[in-house]
Amino acid sequence: MIRANGMDMERISQTLVAPARLDAEREAQLVEWYENLIEMMRMEGVSERGHLQINKNIITLLTDLHLQLLKSTKFPFYSAAYYKALPFIVELRTQGDNRNLSELENCFEVLYGVLLLKLQKRDISEGTLQAVKAISQLLGLLSDYYKKDRAGELEL
């Protein structure tokens, strides 16, 4: 979203901060957060493409948890969500530069791409919407398990 707005804080304030309709204190915090992210992107040399190291670290943690959940027999709903999303993930991995990304990175990339299409008010195919639904369900479950894991409430 930062790159889509040209790393320009004025545009970010108009397109991302203002629509959130926050009180003055929270709005100032959000502006500062975006400013810090922009600075980090410049410092890490990812202004044009690539991900911040902090994002790479989170993807690594999520991937580790994802694999542990799939190996365990305690999480059948997660496994079911994964196998429901898997055909879409496989299709994504065959397109473009996606082969070198992890499955989860592919999932996040498609959600980001669809978000950009929506912001541009472009049409989204029915097949893409089906993929997004399955992938969103998978990532939603993974997010819930990640929060539980971080809180020490998840037994794998």
Named regions from a protein language model:
Residues 29-36, 57, 61-64, 84, ...:
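Charged, amphipathic alpha-helical oligomerization/scaffolding segments
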Residues 21-32, 68-74, 83-95, 113, ...:
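Extended terminal accessory/targeting regions
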Residues 46-90:
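Active-site-proximal alpha-helical scaffolds that flank and shape metal-associated catalytic sites
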Residues 3-5, 22-29, 49-54, 72-80, ...:
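Short acidic, glycine/proline-enriched loop segments that cap or flank alpha-helices
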Residues 33-36, 40, 46-56, 104-108, ...:
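Helix-rich interaction surfaces within compact, conserved domain-sized segments
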Residues 93-156:
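Glycine-rich, aromatic-bearing surface loops/beta-hairpins
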Residues 1-48:
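N-terminal interaction modules that seed assembly of large macromolecular complexes
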